Curated annotation (Swiss-Prot):
Keywords: Chaperone, Cytoplasm, Stress response. Coiled coil: none annotated. One of its GO terms (cellular component) is cytosol. SUPFAM superfamilies: Coiled-coil domain of nucleotide exchange factor GrpE, Head domain of nucleotide exchange factor GrpE. The gene is grpE. Residues 1-55 are annotated as: Disordered. Homodimer. PANTHER family: GRPE PROTEIN, GRPE PROTEIN HOMOLOG, MITOCHONDRIAL. HAMAP family: GrpE (MF_01151). This is Protein GrpE.
Length: 204
């Protein structure tokens, strides 16, 4: 029996076709109403007010200023640290030999003290004095190459507390007050820094 002559088969086919058409119509309606389905989600969004946005912007600008201040402060600290390190390096170069030179000063004092003893016509003593004088000159020249200067004021020079150490004060009629009467011991300075002040007697 052919399907064309079967009413029941025709009815089933018709029902199936109607269901397919209904499904397609539902899909079309779904596409057409997509904007309507999205609308509730849009309505749920809350956009911040102008005042709120301005407040957030102000807080962000304040934070930026704080970070900028912290950066500038850190940069200044780094610059100061770098300068201090450079000064310390320069001091090491200029004054690194300070302790060695200080230890050599008693040697110079001993030679000077020996040369201040009364002269003698004895050939051996004279030869010894000449040797001491040459040694002292050599020592002073060597120290000078390393930035050492001798502090040796003359009588009558003004007393300078930065360079001189007053061992005593004496009243001398012909001397001006606060002037040097006598040098007891020479002083030394290294690159402008006093290692030992000259010891002097000052007029009062």
């Amino acid at each position: 029996m052919s399907s064309k002559n079967n009413p029941e088969s025709e009815t089933k086919a018709k029902n199936k076709w109607e269901k397919v058409m209904e499904a397609e119509e539902e899909q079309e309606e779904g596409r057409g109403d997509g904007s309507q389905e999205m609308e509730p989600h849009r309505e749920g969004l809350e956009f911040p007010s102008r005042e709120k946005l301005e407040g957030q912007l102000t807080r962000m600008e304040r934070k930026v200023d704080e970070y900028k201040t912290q950066y500038l402060r850190a940069q200044a600290e780094m610059d100061n640290l770098r300068k201090r390190i450079e000064r310390e390096k320069a001091d090491i170069i200029k004054f690194g030999s300070k302790q060695l030179i200080t230890d050599l000063l008693p040697v110079a004092d001993s030679l000077i003290h020996g040369l201040e003893s009364p002269a003698s016509e004895d050939p051996q003593v004279k030869s010894m004095r000449d040797g001491m004088s040459l040694t002292l000159d050599l020592l002073h020249n060597t120290l000078a190459k390393h930035g050492v200067q001798v502090i040796n004021p003359n009588p009558g020079d003004p007393f300078d507390p930065a360079l001189h150490e007053a061992m005593s004060v004496q009243a001398v009629p012909d001397a001006k007050p606060d002037t040097i009467i006598q040098v007891l011991q020479k002083g030394y300075q290294l690159n402008g820094r006093v290692l030992r002040a000259a010891r002097v007697i000052v007029a009062g």
